[in-house]
Regions:
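Phosphate-group recognition and catalysis centered on beta-loop-alpha active-site segments
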Residues: 1-155
Length: 155
């Protein structure tokens, strides 16, 4: 019998601000096999981890991810909405999130591609290949056809 995999949706989002590095760390600390994260593209074509198109619910400003630059997003507090102990938690880049997961042996990653763009095959593998160790599993529940192109093969 196969043991089910536990994938923490947006990290340990009950315990920490969703889709943040602290949420991904906590998910692994409590025993998850992997994390699911939402990827969006910023105004200046950077890839960040955030579920909603708008930042309104998680910051003190109103705006859409794709209308804001990486610098503008990195200046925002994405943690205080959850609890004061998470004040100044910043939005994570895809690169930062993948590097964190690569440092936690055996961590599986599922990417949910949220932005209204369709360049997944060229953006996803490049970032993943730079930060993931050989054989690291990755998938995209919303775009299963991209999964083979995103997984890094052992050499």
């Amino acid at each position: 019998m196969t043991t089910p995999q536990i994938i923490a949706h947006r990290g340990a989002s009950y315990l920490a601000p969703e889709n943040t590095l602290v949420a991904f760390r906590k998910a692994m600390e409590i025993g998850a096999d992997g994390v699911e994260m939402d990827v969006q593209k910023t105004y200046d074509n950077e890839l960040v981890i955030h579920h909603d198109y708008m930042v309104d619910m998680h910051t003190d400003i109103s705006g859409q991810i794709y209308d804001l630059t990486m610098g503008e997003l990195k200046a925002l507090d994405f943690g205080s909405w959850k609890d004061a102990i998470y004040a100044n938690e910043r939005i994570a880049t895809l690169q930062e999130a993948l590097e964190l997961c690569a440092g936690m042996e055996g961590t599986q990653v599922q990417l949910e591609l949220k932005s209204p763009w369709r360049t997944t095959p060229t953006l996803c593998p490049g970032c993943w290949m730079r930060s993931a160790p050989p054989g690291s599993p990755i998938g995209s529940p919303s775009s299963p056809s991209t999964t083979p192109s995103c997984g890094r093969q052992s050499s």
